[in-house]
Amino acid sequence: MLKNRVEVDRRRLDFSEESSAGEYNGKYLGFHEQAGETGTYRKVIYSQEGKLVPPQYHTWDRNPHHKDTSPSDKKYHSEYREGESDSRLDTPISIEAKWSHYSSEYFEASDSEEFDEKLASLRLLILEAEEEMRRIVQGRVDKHLEMNKEANEKKKEMKRRKREVLGEVNKVRGEAGDRDDRSCERPEEESDAKGTRIESFADFETSMFPYKSKNGAKSYACPYEGCTMELPTLSRIKRHYIVHTKLRPFKCLNKDCNKRFSRKDNMLQHYKIHCNYSNYR
């Protein structure tokens, strides 16, 4: 310990002599090791040959009334810290501190610029995606409208052709109707007689079928012997009864035709053959 203290004193004397002789560069950079009211700072000095002079640690005080000690003052306190490695002599601590300060600012600026670039690229990608989606949707809408337009045109064409065909059919039917009216003319007395026979037969049929009501349900019973069929409507029971009797009361209205039918609708359907309606059934 005593040996180290002697070495420090010797270096301090050498430093004082060199500072008075002006053989070193007096410019130095320091840093504060503590953030309190008092602390130490290290002074780094380079000689004219470029060699690093061992660092000196000086005390400092934040008190504004305190006077800083100058390097030429013999009363300033300096010490050489024990236990420090020789690597500190190779690289100036002040340069390291200054570089760390500027490097942190540089990295912060570079990070901010990089973030702005990424944000701008992300916004550009979003805009491109929205534009692409807009094009896709618009394309589908246009395609749908085009398909609807084609379908509507086809429907219009089909309706036009249908009107033309129906017009031709109605024209032919009108001409055929005029001929049928002339060919189907019959004496008024004959038609009245046939109508009377049909009506009387219908009345006779109606009186044949007794009406029943059971628990609010209507029904007509078949009058044929041995048949127990009951149907809810008169028309149905009539059709059923004709199966038993084999009656064909409805004769064709054409005087040249002798066909007879069990139902009036069947007779009228047959009568259209004589009126040239067979092509339109």
UniProtKB/Swiss-Prot annotation:
The keyword Repeat applies. GO terms for cellular component: chromatin; PcG protein complex; transcription regulator complex. The keyword Zinc-finger applies. GO terms for molecular function: DNA-binding transcription factor activity, RNA polymerase II-specific; RNA polymerase II cis-regulatory region sequence-specific DNA binding; zinc ion binding. Gene3D superfamilies: Classic Zinc Finger. Keywords: Metal-binding, Repeat, Zinc, Zinc-finger. Residues 1-23, 55-88, 168-195 are annotated as: Disordered. This is Zinc finger C2H2 protein ECU05_0610. It comes from Encephalitozoon cuniculi (strain GB-M1).
